[in-house]
Amino acid sequence: MRNSIKIFALIFFNISLSQGVVGAWERYEITESGKQKQVVIFSDKFQAISIYDANTGKFIYSNGGTWKLNGNTMTEKVEFDTGNPERVGTEVSFEIKLNENTLEVVNAGSKWKRIDNGTPGDLNGAWLMSGRYRNGVKQTRRTDGPRKTMKLLSGTRFQWIAYNTETKQFMGTGGGTYSTVNGVYKENIEFFSRDDSKAGLKLEFDYEIIDGDWNHKGFSSKGDPLHEIWSRRK
């Protein structure tokens, strides 16, 4: 009976700790090239970190993939890494310290301040692009292959990433803040790897959840009309 209680308590502790990680975190670092802003977003199973110039939005670095927590040890499996593609498919483990508003990576000596805990945005979690409409015709795409376009959202932050886990290729990323109010999804772009001049751009879309999928309609950062379909990543 005591062993059962201990096991239950350990499971409950791990679940509580994992739920505490979910959301968005940030830190700043002063380097020779200027002030860097670093943001990491955690959903229940997936995470992504972005690093960019805090003043200009110039993109610097990103990596991400899956994560799990065992006690205070976090293990991440890398799905993309803009600085070192050979890390794709590998796992890295490290000790963390967590409280309500601070996440510390012990060996790295880095401390992150909480931005949000996964609220209040309606779309928090990990999504994969699963289709789009072209000239009114719906086109679907597989989400179980190595080529992925993933969008990771906390309660207030978003990041999209296009990559291939098989070839280890990184195709692009962008991110910033978002809000969802009365069926309107608004983005404030803070970085965009393909074109740094997009930083500061504000975009507005209509959104609707249909059969569990996120329908995303409006105009792209290039001004082209779009209607994308995103499915929750499991």
Residue ranges and their predicted role:
Residues 1-24:
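Bacterial Sec-dependent N-terminal signal peptides
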Residues 175-181:
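Beta-propeller blade signature
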Residues 18-173, 184-234:
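Lipid interaction determinants
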